[in-house]
Amino acid sequence: MLTPEENLLLCRVEGDAPMGQMMRRHWTPVCLLEEVSEPDGTPVRARLFGEDLVVFRDTDGRVGVMDEYCPHRRVSLIYGRNENSGLRCLYHGWKMDVDGNVVEMVSEPAASNMCQKVKHTAYKTREWGGFVWAYMGPQDAIPEFVPPAWAPHEHVRVSIAKAIIPCNWAQILEGAIDSAHSSSLHSSDFVPARVGGAEATSKNWLRPSTDKAPRMQVERTSYGFRYAALRRPIQNAATSEYVRSTVFVAPATALIPPNNLYNVANINVPIDDTHTAFYFMAWGNPDNTPETETWRKFLGQQVGIDLDDSYRPLRNDGNRFFQDREAMKNGNFTGIKGFPNQDIAMWVTMGPIADRSDERLGASDLAVVEFRRVMLDALAAFQAGESAIGTGEKAIPSRICSFQAIVSKDIDWRDYQARYVWALDDANIVAEPDYEVHT
C-alpha cells in the first residue's frame, strides 16, 4: 500500500515529474522499426513521457525523432513532406533534418541567416531489436547504446506485439512481474502437464505444476531485482521445486521466464500519465522463435483483428473485452481470448492510475511491493544527485536472464546457472486430468 503522494511519485512521468526525468536517462523504444521502414515514407506520430514526437526515415535511410510541432508556428509535422533528406512543414516550407537542423526556410529572404539561429528539438536514435530507440535525457551527456538483455546480438530473432493501453505504466509493470496471477487469470492458457519444464505448443504454454499459491523470494540488484516463485511440481514434489524466476530491469522491462523454445520479455513505455505502449517480445533462435505475425496471432494482438491501425485494442471496457460467458460456463476461466488481453482487462479496470492507498496485499504480492520500493528508493537517490538506476556505476549487466526449471530442494535458486533458451528440446507432453492441451 502506498500513500497518495507516493503513488503519484511512482506513476507521474510528464514534464518535470521526477520519475519521468529519471526514466529519460535510459535509451527508450519510440516505435517499431516496421512503422518507419520506408525511406521518404509517411511520418509516424509517437508520444513519450507526455511529449509529442514525429518519427521518420529520411532519403538516406536515417531515422529522425523530433518534436512533432514545427519550430516556426507549431504546426504538426506529421503531415509534412518527407523528401530530400529532411522533413518539410507544409505551412511555410521550413525543412528539418534528422538532427533538428533547419536546413531550409523558403519563406525567408535568400540572404537571411535565420536557419543558423534556429534548432529544432531532436533526439539521438538507434535501431536495434525491432525498435527505433531514442535518448530523451540531457543531450550533452548521451550514454552509449547497449543492446538489451532480450536482444543480446544481431543473430537473435525478436518478434514483437505492440498495444497502446489506456492506463498508467506502473500497473502494467506490476502485472508483468506478478507470477501468482498466471495460475488463475491465465489458467486456461498456461496448462499444467507432466513435462520437464515450461513448454510451448501452437495454442498453449504448458507448466509442470498445479500449485496456485507460489512461495515468493526476492533478491534486490543494482539494476532492479530478481525473484523466484516456488511451486510444487507435479512430479518429484518431495525432492524438487518448480522455480519461475522473473527479472525486473529498471525502469520498465520485465524478463519473463521462458519456455522450451524461446525467451519472453516485455517493455512498458510511458506515453503519458494515463497511457502506455506495451511491447511483448518473443526472442531467441530463429529456428525456434515464432515469426512476428505468428506471435501476434498466438497472443490475440493482430492489427485489423484485435487492434486498430493505431495499435489500440478493439476489446475494451465498453464491450466487456469481448468476454464469452458461455465459454466460461464450459470451463474457460476468463472467457477472454489471448492471455495478454486478459491482462489488459485487469490493468484497464484498475482505472487510468491505480489507487494503491486502499489495497490488501498478501504474501503473493512480494514482487509488487519490491518494485515499488526499488523505484521509490531509486527516485530518492536520483533526486539527491546520484545517477539513475541502471546507469553509470549501476549499469545493467550484459548477461542477465530469467529462467524456469525444476530444481532440487538442495539448490538455492539464486545459485542456479540460468541461461537464455537457444537450443530446441524435445517435448513429451502428458496433460494433467481436467486440463486440455492444444498442439
From Swiss-Prot:
It is an enzyme of class 1 (oxidoreductase). GO terms for molecular function: 2 iron, 2 sulfur cluster binding; iron ion binding; phthalate 4,5-dioxygenase activity. Keywords: 2Fe-2S, Aromatic hydrocarbons catabolism, Dioxygenase, Iron, Iron-sulfur, Metal-binding, NAD, Oxidoreductase, Plasmid. Residues 27-134 form the Rieske domain. Pathway: Xenobiotic degradation; phthalate degradation; 3,4-dihydroxybenzoate from phthalate: step 1/3. It catalyses: phthalate + NADH + O2 + H(+) = cis-4,5-dihydroxycyclohexa-2,6-diene-1,2-dicarboxylate + NAD(+). Its cofactor is [2Fe-2S] cluster; Fe cation. GO terms for biological process: phthalate catabolic process. Signal peptide: none annotated. Fe cation binds at residues 181, 186. Its EC number is 1.14.12.7. Binds 1 [2Fe-2S] cluster. Binds 1 Fe cation. [2Fe-2S] cluster binds at residues 70, 72, 89, 92. Induction: Induced by phthalate and repressed by glucose. It holds the Pfam family LigXa_C. Belongs to the bacterial ring-hydroxylating dioxygenase alpha subunit family. This dioxygenase system consists of two proteins: phthalate oxygenase and phthalate oxygenase reductase. This is Phthalate 4,5-dioxygenase oxygenase subunit.
